[in-house]
Swiss-Prot record:
Name of the protein in its database record: Carotenoid cleavage dioxygenase 8 homolog A, chloroplastic
Cell inner membrane recorded as keyword: no
Annotated Fe cation binding sites: 239, 289, 356, 543
Comp. bias (Polar residues): 59-72
Cited function: May be involved in strigolactones biosynthesis.
Keywords: Chloroplast, Dioxygenase, Iron, Metal-binding, Oxidoreductase, Plastid, Transit peptide
Class in the EC hierarchy, top level: oxidoreductase
Annotated source species: Oryza sativa subsp. japonica
InterPro entries in alphabetical order: Carotenoid_Oase (IPR004294)
Keyword DNA-binding: no
Tissues expressing this chain: Highly expressed in panicles, inflorescences and parenchyma cells of the root stele, and at lower levels in shoot apex, leaf buds and xylem parenchyma cells of the stem.
Subcellular location: Plastid, Chloroplast
Gene Ontology molecular function: carotenoid dioxygenase activity; metal ion binding
Organelle transit peptide residues: 1-43
Length: 552
């Protein structure tokens, strides 16, 4: 049972920030002011000095000060949350964020940000008169997490963690079989959280076995999502494209280098192959964390950071973990028709490094093309090493965050062998930091104007702003608060909205003073309208989703 702490909701106080924010006219206040006594009572629940971690069986929300790269101190918590500012009356639903939240187990400390065991954070909003917010966090009980807690050390292979090699020849052979079959790879689903079209909610990362169902109300782990097809494979995209009717993803083939483009209908557990895209360079597929789609096409990226079978089978860390950086192998972008499975374009492009794609759309006419936007690191994989936990903790305030931009590919559909890669927006507009983008989902696969990202206010060693980028007017606006690390800004459209940026942006923020809160920005003005405080600090997380409240 989750440990419970009830706090006093204080629905409408002026938001506090280092910047000056005005309430957006589209989102009128409908709640009363909080008293200073209430706020002091809330803050008294957060310890102001270092203490031993609270175990999963402890009561209360006793925690130490937390920074973005420090583990959560208890397995779960649930309670009411105080509101500063005003929630819009239409904001009724639940925001869930997934990400690594536990980097320490027993005496073992993980090496890389991507290693941490998945921690879900939930904030449920009820706007309007009598506004209320409730929150919770909970560890996803994957096989990897349960085994690590039971043994006091990691058992399965994580992003940068290789379990100690077995001593006997027989056990070493067993370890090798486990790696070849994928059984020894993690099922720690610490990347994305997605509402499927049938009401189920899935969390996942890049191993196929990491697809896990959760209960969005309690955050309980329901169990592994069991695919009923025979497609197999060890890895998948961590960011499938999900709509009300389908689930579209890519399955890298490490044996015959290429990718399967597959579709799964809402309500089904069976993936069906749309088509196969062979790789053009290198001995293996490029790392494929995410991809893009248009209304007609799936876009398959092939970058020179490639899966490495040798590194996967090794018992010690390689320079790029499970990958090799092979710029001589070339960089390519492939376009497949979603209805026929036919390849309509396959072009060579300048070297690129992109973990997250933003959106894509089609341009018609005499110069028909597919345009694809991504968070691009100038063809440099240094961002991978930047996310080593020791660097994140020791280099705070140092200007070591690698440069990034909105990279825009233009893929001609006339059979040309080459595509273009340009910068879609002056990188100084967003501090030369760019990652964790979201868009209005109504613009998925279509021409669009706005995206919401984590940018940078330098000097910094990690993205530290929320930034609205305007790809038509070529400008950006940022929210920043000193000492705070925001996670992905997630766009939630106002019901019935017609303007692309009519809604709010939600981000979970970790701060150096040991606090954590959900920040709500007016997406049009990009000004703060509310923050919902947790009684303890929150670790950094990756991606979120929005589940609208059902009508009563």
């Amino acid at each position: 049972m989750a440990t419970s702490l009830t706090l006093i909701a204080t629905p409408c106080t002026a938001p506090r920030s280092s910047s000056s924010f005005a309430l957006a006219p589209r989102l009128p206040p409908r709640c009363s002011n909080a008293t200073a006594a209430r706020r002091r009572a809330v803050r008294a629940t957060t310890l102001q000095s270092d203490q031993e971690p609270a175990g999963s069986g402890d009561s209360g929300a006793t925690t130490t000060k937390l920074s973005a790269s420090t583990s959560v101190r208890q397995e779960r918590w649930e309670g009411d949350l105080p509101i500063e500012g005003c929630l819009p009356p239409w904001l009724n639903g639940t925001y869930i964020r997934n990400g690594p939240g536990m980097w320490d187990v027993g005496e073992h400390a993980f090496h890389h940000l991507f290693d941490g065991y998945a921690t879900l954070v939930r904030v449920s909003f009820r706007g309007g008169g009598g506004a209320r917010a409730t929150g919770a966090h909970r560890q996803i009980e994957s096989e990897a997490y349960r085994a690590a807690v039971a043994r006091g050390r990691p058992v399965l292979r994580e992003f940068s963690h290789c379990p100690a090699p077995a001593k006997s020849l027989l056990h070493r052979f067993g370890d090798l079989v486990g790696l070849v079959t994928g059984a020894a790879l993690t099922d720690n689903p610490n990347s994305a959280v997605l509402p499927l079209g049938d009401g189920r909610v899935m969390c996942l990362t890049e191993t196929t076995k990491s697809s896990v169902l959760i209960d969005p109300d309690t955050l309980e782990t329901v169990g592994r999502f069991r695919y009923t097809d025979r497609l197999g494979g060890m890895v998948q995209s961590a960011h499938p494209i999900v709509t009300d009717t389908e689930f579209l993803t890519l399955l890298p083939d490490l044996v015959r280098p290429g990718h399967l483009v597959v579709r799964m209908e809402a309500g089904s557990n069976e993936r069906k192959v749309i088509g196969r895209m062979d790789c053009r360079g290198g001995p293996s597929p490029g790392w494929l964390h995410s991809f893009a789609v248009t209304e007609k096409y799936a876009v398959v990226p092939e970058m020179p950071l490639r899966y490495s079978s040798a590194s996967l089978l090794a018992s010690e860390l390689a320079p790029f973990y499970a990958f090799d950086w092979v710029p001589a192998s070339g960089s390519y972008m492939h376009v497949m028709c979603k209805s026929t499975g036919k390849t309509v374009a396959s072009v060579e492009v300048p070297p690129f490094m992109a973990i997250h794609f933003i959106n894509a759309y089609e341009e018609e006419g005499d110069e028909a093309a597919v345009v694809v936007d991504c968070c691009e690191h100038y063809g440099d994989p240094a961002i991978i090493e930047t996310l080593v936990l020791s660097r994140l903790r020791l280099l705070r305030g140092k200007d070591v965050l690698p440069n990034a931009r909105v990279g825009r590919f233009r893929i001609p559909l006339d059979g040309s062998p080459f595509g273009e890669l340009e910068t879609a927006l002056d990188p100084e507009e967003h501090g030369r930091g760019m990652d964790m983008c979201s868009i209005n989902p109504a613009r998925l696969g279509r021409k669009y104007q706005y995206a919401y990202a984590c940018g940078a206010r330098r000097p910094c060693n990690f993205p530290n702003t929320l930034t609205k980028i305007d790809l038509v007017e070529k400008k950006a606006k940022s929210w920043h608060e000193e000492g705070s690390v925001p996670s992905e800004p997630f766009f939630v459209a106002r019901p019935g909205a017609t303007d692309e940026d009519d809604g709010v942006v939600i981000s979970i923020v970790s701060s150096d003073d040991g606090e954590g809160y959900a920040l709500v920005l007016d997406a049009t003005t990009f000004e703060e309208i509310a923050r919902v405080r947790f009684p303890y600090g929150l670790p950094y997380g990756f991606h979120g989703c929005w589940i609208p409240a059902t009508e009563e």
